[in-house]
Amino acid sequence: MAAEIIDGKAFAAKVRGQVTEHVTRLKEEHGITPGLAVVLVGEDPASQVYVRSKGKQTVEVGMNSYEHKLDADTSEADLLALIDQLNKDSEVHGILVQLPLPKHLDEDLVINSIAPEKDVDGFHISNVGLLGTGQKSMVPCTPLGCLMMLRDYHGSLSGLDAVVIGRSNIVGKPMAQLLLGDSCTVTIAHSRTKDLPEVVRRADIVVAAVGRPEMVPGDWIKEGATVIDVGINRIDAPEKGEGKTRLVGDVHYESAAARAGAITPVPGGVGPMTIACLLANTVTACCRANNLSEPEGLTA
């Protein structure tokens, strides 16, 4: 059987359309424009690309975009002072500090200085705790995007067996919490899990977020399972020419697609959903800040 391809680009466009509708409604009915502030420290090329893309998409959905670009040698005190200023700014509903930060800055300290209600990345320890106890929180963008795609494909996830491969604070752990919240039976697996192939073969849903190129072969996948591949790995591609590379996920796509019922490609699967969910979180944060009903379909 050939798996159905879950098109992340198309789904992200749908989410951005929903965000645009909510932003328009907030402007017309309440005179409120959601605002997202992105802080970039240093000149990391990949981070610069991400920040430009976030700013562009923020404006396209009708929100205000505030970019703060700081020198790589910016002191921790100056960065914390900027975040404090943004925390107090009523025009700013979401704050994102682009990671990684230069080594002299304490990432945990910086992230936890963001007001939890404006932490649209969902990394603040308060949001982590709220998610872990099943309470209303800001949810990390990548797991939220995965959950949206799974709900769209399956409808109800209740009772399904899910395996999350990877235990990071950014994807693995929050993904498991979200699946638990939707009444899945969840296993968190990782590189040291005993008999990992058999663990994965039992799963109706496989979320791979371990950061190892093509680690999961197709024969680990249960017939008809849904595969969400969060991995983005660049590997050599000599078939394209000397020095050429290509992007692959944590799952071997061709062999997995032959067995799965549905699968996300890399690229074009989970990746586009991350920024779309950042925009969704910003609208959610804006609604909460103004005691308005939250947008349906854009939250966990």
Curated annotation (Swiss-Prot):
Q: One MF term in GO for this entry?
A: methylenetetrahydrofolate dehydrogenase (NADP+) activity
Q: In which pathway does it act?
A: One-carbon metabolism; tetrahydrofolate interconversion
Output one GO BP term.
Answer: purine nucleotide biosynthetic process
Instruction: List GO terms (cellular component aspect).
Output: cytosol
Gene3D superfamilies (alphabetical): Leucine Dehydrogenase, chain A, domain 1 (3.40.50.10860), NAD(P)-binding Rossmann-like Domain (3.40.50.720)
Arranged from A to Z, the UniProt key words for this protein are: Amino-acid biosynthesis, Histidine biosynthesis, Hydrolase, Methionine biosynthesis, Multifunctional enzyme, NADP, One-carbon metabolism, Oxidoreductase, Purine biosynthesis
The UniProt record gives the binding positions of NADP(+) as 166-168, 191, 232
* InterPro entries (alphabetical): Aminoacid_DH-like_N_sf (IPR046346), NAD(P)-bd_dom_sf (IPR036291), THF_DH/CycHdrlase (IPR000672), THF_DH/CycHdrlase_cat_dom (IPR020630), THF_DH/CycHdrlase_CS (IPR020867), THF_DH/CycHdrlase_NAD-bd_dom (IPR020631)
Reactions this protein catalyses: (6R)-5,10-methylene-5,6,7,8-tetrahydrofolate + NADP(+) = (6R)-5,10-methenyltetrahydrofolate + NADPH; (6R)-5,10-methenyltetrahydrofolate + H2O = (6R)-10-formyltetrahydrofolate + H(+)
Q: What is its EC number?
A: 1.5.1.5, 3.5.4.9
- The residues that cross the membrane are none
Q: Give the protein's biological function.
A: Catalyzes the oxidation of 5,10-methylenetetrahydrofolate to 5,10-methenyltetrahydrofolate and then the hydrolysis of 5,10-methenyltetrahydrofolate to 10-formyltetrahydrofolate.
Subunit (UniProt): Homodimer.
Family per similarity comment: Belongs to the tetrahydrofolate dehydrogenase/cyclohydrolase family.
Q: Write the protein's name.
A: Bifunctional protein FolD
Organism phylogeny: Bacteria, Pseudomonadati, Pseudomonadota, Alphaproteobacteria, Rhodobacterales
Q: Which gene encodes it?
A: folD
